[in-house]
Amino acid sequence: MKKHIITILVFTTGLNLFSQSNIENQIFDIGIESIDSFREFLSIKNDANFKNEMKPLIEWGINNFKKYGFEVERLETPELPLLLASKVISEDLNTLLIYLQFDGQPVDNSKWDQENPYKAVLKERINDEYKITDWGKLDNLTFDDIKKDDLRIFARSASDAKGPVMMILNALEIMKRNNIELEYNLKVIMDFEEEISSPNLADAVKKYSSKLKSDALLIFDGPKHPSNLPTLTFGARGISDITLITYGPI
């Protein structure tokens, strides 16, 4: 069952302008403010096996990156498009490309201890079990309170991988409120078919290579370190498989 600890990642560029405590307070406040938006995001179906249901998710991606001054274009493929959001500060600056995944694993309602996997619920840990609690419990809490009660949001893709999308948007919101300017160009590629092995991604990268051209790539996905600290992983393994054919009685 997917769960998302209420925590927000913020870009570090320009944070030296503010005290650490001020930034931490803003991260928490904006994280709480964004809960309703996150719940709305989680309510949008994102199973790439049902392509006719993915349009609202694609529109959500377009609208939410446009709010932060990005130019967003569809990179068409034979099936679902990719989205490319670009914010070019200067052609003389380096460019960072961020990869985000929007789709999620198929849903088996029978395995979820809640009304609907696409209807997010807040749970707290009681005697080693997570029990549904009221969203109002988040009112007037500190981050230490949330950690103490082990409050978590349960919904399909709350962690894998709508959580990282919301983290990026909240980071952009903090930068906007504090008038922090990017010191590099930023591009974001949004994949709506990752959980079905991104069948069109490789060809799209070749076809749109000039649009995707960047100096560095950050894949905003994957598990955190067991310490629960923010993690940067330098390099990623690929995947391989074998087909084993047996003959005779088993």
Language-model features and meaning:
Residues 21-154, 165, 177-182:
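Acidic/His- and Gly-rich active-site-bordering loop/insert found
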Residues 15-19:
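Sec/Tat signal peptide C-region and signal peptidase I cleavage site
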Residues 233-247:
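Flexible glycine/proline-rich, aromatic-decorated loop/lid segments
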Residues 99-101, 218-221, 245:
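Short beta-strand segments
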Residues 147-235:
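Acidic/histidine-rich catalytic neighborhood of metal-dependent amide-processing enzymes
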